[in-house]
């Protein structure tokens, strides 16, 4: 079952940005994708992990910070707080023809991150809908009859997790990329009472990118 939360908090009206526009100058270019491997999430109370992580990110935002480091802080908070198997930040490429994973945490992320990406197309698959229509997706069962046809083949071959989330990131009506995360079992990828934490974490990245442009 897909729970479609739309629209995301922030500037979400989708329009295509100019080709080659530098939409997130604070994110350092990489010749190869960056990744950090983690073991399974710890057993600390998830809600405490989320609240403490959000507070730490808030404190960082009022100091001098590197955007890459802050992205990793957000990913770690998501990974540990929501007990995900894998989390990734995927970025829109400058020509705006492809979204590609750039940072990640979790099991086998070093193998996944270079292959996790997709071309922008007029398609009914979940990833293209997310970035073209500014829609969040929380997938409880990727093999459910109502959603199976919208899960693209590249994803089936690369990850094929039973439950996952797609949270696009928009600033000034332009999509910069998305957060992706998954779990190994079917069921809600984020508990209903923790959805607001995910919105806060995304908004913190939006604030960080805006500050990096000043």
Task: List each model region and its residues.
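Metal-dependent nucleotide-binding catalytic modules
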Residues: 1-47
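Regulatory loop-to-helix N-cap segments in sensory/regulatory domains
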Residues: 43-45, 183-201, 208-212
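A short, aliphatic-rich beta-strand micro-motif
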Residues: 162-170
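Helix-loop-beta substructure at the N-terminus of cytosolic sensory domains
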Residues: 64-101
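GAF sensory/regulatory domain recognition
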Residues: 90-118, 122
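Signal-transducing coupling segments at domain and membrane junctions
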Residues: 142-162
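Short regulatory/linker helices and ligand/cofactor-binding micro-motifs at input modules
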Residues: 37-41, 52-69, 77
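Regulatory sensory and allosteric helical modules in signal-transduction proteins
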Residues: 110-147
């Amino acid at each position: 079952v897909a729970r479609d939360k739309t629209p995301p908090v922030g500037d979400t009206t989708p329009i295509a940005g100019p080709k080659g526009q530098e939409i997130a100058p604070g994110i350092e270019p990489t010749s190869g994708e960056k990744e950090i491997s983690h073991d399974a999430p710890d057993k600390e109370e998830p809600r405490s992990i989320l609240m403490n992580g959000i507070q730490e990110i808030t404190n960082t935002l009022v100091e001098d910070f590197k955007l890459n480091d802050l992205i990793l802080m957000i990913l770690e908070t998501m990974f540990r707080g929501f007990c995900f198997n894998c989390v990734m930040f995927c970025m829109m490429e400058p020509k705006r023809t492809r979204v590609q994973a750039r940072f990640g945490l979790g099991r086998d992320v070093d193998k996944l991150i270079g292959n996790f990406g997709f071309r922008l197309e007029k398609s009914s698959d979940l990833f293209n809908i997310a970035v073209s229509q500014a829609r969040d997706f929380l997938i409880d069962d990727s093999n459910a009859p109502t959603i199976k046809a919208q899960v693209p083949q590249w994803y089936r071959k690369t990850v094929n997790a039973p439950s996952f989330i797609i949270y696009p990131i928009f600033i000034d009506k332009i999509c910069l990329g998305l957060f992706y995360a998954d779990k190994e079992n079917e069921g809600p990828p984020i508990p209903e009472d923790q959805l607001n934490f995910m919105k806060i974490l995304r908004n913190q990245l939006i604030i960080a990118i805006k500050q990096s442009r000043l």
